[in-house]
């Protein structure tokens, strides 16, 4: 068996990636989230496949087809709620994975980091088009509001919006194409994830100390396969608790009402995992400015490798930047809260302050703290 796994053309790739892979001996549980994201992706593809067998992407039957899945299909309610809450688990793991990357300086591996940003954007696009499919009130109005943002693009904006809609409003053509996108994008995510792994295994993993670990490596199997399995079981436990006991806690009550173009919900908002970006979008009064800020809120992650001036890897020995990092996390939570609030005082003002703080921390405070710490080391 040993000879086979080391010599067989296909098994050799698996062996080098998951069995004999030299791994730092000190990586903590924060490194588990890569495998958890892979697990979430598999769960989403499998549950999504079974949902697609019963779903109809037509404006007249989409809402009732989801109701049919929950009522008449064997364990359809479970598949539907695993898929809906699986998306939330996916984003929780994604945010922690990115947060760990920032804390421990994983952005130094720039190719892996940049592919990760593309993965993040693709996952956000997949979740957005997926949210439209049940064709409830929030699905319809969320799709209308977010796609309408493209009209802020000079000259081609209105044409682009009508092209995406497939008409003069969000309608049957929009729903059909969004279903097609939602079906194909997870497979693109899978391909990108393999490229992400490929680049990671070219350089090897980072580790909590931020020091070179070439002299202290252990094989991935059995040490980290066991550790990852524990993480996967805990993830499945949390997902099952969510799906079985609190299936609608992260959803929107408006989505239990079929889409009605003549009745606008009181507060239009996306799913919870987009609220931080939505708050940044709303905090700028100008439409084009808001759209640019929304895009920059994600693309600014690409600036981390460029703005890094620290002589140390990661924040474990950098107390000043550690404080700034945790302020940044708290600020993100404030933005998430504000994104779900109505557009009125004091929420608008808090949102504007939090949005300015978000960009200030990344562009100014972190590089300045890096310089301060470099000077402290010299003393």
Swiss-Prot record:
Binding sites annotated in the UniProt record for a ubiquinone: 201
Top-rank taxon: Eukaryota
Subunit structure: The cytochrome bc1 complex contains 11 subunits: 3 respiratory subunits (MT-CYB, CYC1 and UQCRFS1), 2 core proteins (UQCRC1 and UQCRC2) and 6 low-molecular weight proteins (UQCRH/QCR6, UQCRB/QCR7, UQCRQ/QCR8, UQCR10/QCR9, UQCR11/QCR10 and a cleavage product of UQCRFS1). This cytochrome bc1 complex then forms a dimer.
InterPro entries (alphabetical): Cyt_b/b6_C (IPR005798), Cyt_b/b6_C_sf (IPR036150), Cyt_b/b6_N (IPR005797), Cytb/b6-like_sf (IPR027387), Cytochrome_b (IPR030689), Cytochrome_b_C_euk/bac (IPR048260), Cytochrome_b_N_euk/bac (IPR048259), Di-haem_cyt_TM (IPR016174)
Family from the record: Belongs to the cytochrome b family.
Official protein name in the record: Cytochrome b
Protein source organism: Akodon juninensis (Junin grass mouse)
Subcellular locations according to the entry: Mitochondrion inner membrane
Membrane topology value: Multi-pass membrane protein
CC cofactor: heme b
A Pfam family it matches: Cytochrom_B_C
Residues that hold heme b b562 according to the record: 83, 182
Lineage: Eukaryota, Metazoa, Chordata, Craniata, Vertebrata
UniProt remark on cofactor binding: Binds 2 heme b groups non-covalently.
MF terms (GO), sorted A to Z: metal ion binding; ubiquinol-cytochrome-c reductase activity
Keyword Lipid biosynthesis listed: no
Cited function: Component of the ubiquinol-cytochrome c reductase complex (complex III or cytochrome b-c1 complex) that is part of the mitochondrial respiratory chain. The b-c1 complex mediates electron transfer from ubiquinol to cytochrome c. Contributes to the generation of a proton gradient across the mitochondrial membrane that is then used for ATP synthesis.
GO CC, alphabetical: mitochondrial inner membrane; respiratory chain complex III
Gene it is expressed from: MT-CYB
Miscellaneous: Heme 1 (or BL or b562) is low-potential and absorbs at about 562 nm, and heme 2 (or BH or b566) is high-potential and absorbs at about 566 nm.
GO BP terms, alphabetized: mitochondrial electron transport, ubiquinol to cytochrome c
Residues that span the membrane, as ranges: 33-53, 77-98, 113-133, 178-198, 226-246, 288-308, 320-340, 347-367
Positions contributing to heme b b566 binding: 97, 196
Keywords: Electron transport, Heme, Iron, Membrane, Metal-binding, Mitochondrion, Mitochondrion inner membrane, Respiratory chain, Transmembrane, Transmembrane helix, Transport, Ubiquinone
Family annotation (PROSITE patterns): CYTB_CTER, CYTB_NTER
